[in-house]
Regions:
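N-terminal Rossmann-like NAD(P)+-binding domain of SDR-like oxidoreductases, especially those catalyzing
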Residues: 1-142
Length: 142
């Protein structure tokens, strides 16, 4: 079967990325590549093995050499970028990892710019709230 639309989901073993992947593979016109380093994700969140139109690749998108190979091989139509450190307290405890995530989106945008990628979908995180005044944080505390 020829797959018409190739989709990359970074962070696809996380909550949001995994839910998106599970929904997309229900439609056979999509071929989904899930890239995740499993630092916060879980293989339990991947789509069912009954679907054959997806694959999992262990990858750290913050490392250009890892994600560039995947992008080159697959020539994606769309990229959903969900790979990031998640959770306000986790990001506070790991500020260097948060800064490393900037490399991830830079890599995705740079590799997508002159490729077959038609659109990149970027989901932000709790980092948009800035330094917390109190925890837990919500829209009213910023």
């Amino acid at each position: 079967m020829k797959f018409m639309i190739k989709i990359l989901i970074t962070g696809g073993a996380g909550n949001v990325g995994g839910a998106l992947a599970r929904k997309l593979v229900e439609n056979q016109k999509y071929f989904v590549v899930i890239a995740d380093d499993l630092s916060t994700g879980s293989k339990d969140k991947l789509p069912s093995s009954k679907y054959t139109n997806w694959t999992f690749v262990y990858c750290d998108v913050n490392k250009y050499e890892e994600i560039s190979q995947i992008m080159l091989v697959h020539q994606f139509d769309y990229v959903f970028h969900y790979a990031a450190v998640v959770g306000v307290s986790w990001t506070q405890e790991n500020p260097i990892m948060v800064l490393n995530d900037i490399e991830g989106i830079k890599n995705i945008l740079q590799l997508s710019k002159n490729s077959s990628v038609k659109r990149v979908f970027f989901s932000s995180s709790s980092e948009v709230y800035g330094e917390p005044v109190e925890l837990p944080q919500n829209e009213d505390t910023t």
